[in-house]
Amino acid sequence: RGVCSTPEGSCVHNGCICQNAPCCHPSGCNWANVCPGYLWDKN
């Protein structure tokens, strides 16, 4: 919930807002509030 997995995992390309959690990032996980390009992980 609120955690985006790495590109190797499951990522949905459509922009995501992650707070206090590693976000999906083209080059891996990144701690940020807004991570454009990916959605929250369904888990």
Swiss-Prot record:
Propeptide: 1
NAD found in the keyword field: no
Disulfide bridges in this chain: C4-C16, C11-C24, C18-C29, C23-C35
Gene Ontology MF term list: ion channel regulator activity; toxin activity
GO cellular component terms attached to this protein's record: extracellular region
Known function: Mu-conotoxins block voltage-gated sodium channels. This toxin reversibly blocks voltage-gated sodium channel in cephalopods, with no alteration in the voltage dependence of sodium conductance or on the kinetics of inactivation.
Stated name of the protein: Mu-conotoxin-like Cal 12.2c
Organism: Californiconus californicus
